[in-house]
Amino acid sequence: QRNLAAASRYEQVIEAFSRNDVNGGFRLADDLIQSFPSTAYADQANLAVARIQVENKQLDPAVARLRQVLASTKDAELALIVRLRLARVQLSQGKADDALKTLDAVTPGAFAARYAEVRGDVLLAKGDRDGALKAYREARSGDSTTIDTGLLDLKIGELARS
């Protein structure tokens, strides 16, 4: 019964965002999170809000949402995905060192290629072209189903030429 109610609320959140009712979506998401904390629906609502916040360049609140999911989720794979998103947002904030710490805090498992690519982006932003190239090559040698190999090949090609 409780999961059904949480699912219904989550559906309302997504519908509000799909109608571009950002304020309504935020309000519904916060209500869901408060009413059904520590549920997968609360985590997903936080992720939906964080995505909208990133799109609207509200990076600090997005970081807070992502950290909230990391603190509450019981899903190890979701936590790995959230860490990737958090590192990307931190990089967008110009906090490359924080992004590296976020990436290095866990063993990425099946997401190793994606972690290596983001690590490459962070190292490149820090001016470490050799480190970035090494990370991109590591990503390219990983599971090609989890990464955009075309984009990765462009990144590798650009760095290898310079």
Regions found by a protein language model. Name each.
Residues 7-47:
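Short extracytoplasmic
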Residues 22-23, 59, 96, 129:
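TPR-repeat structural position
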Residues 33-42, 71-79, 106-114, 141-150:
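Short solvent-exposed coil/turn linkers within tandem alpha-helical repeat scaffolds
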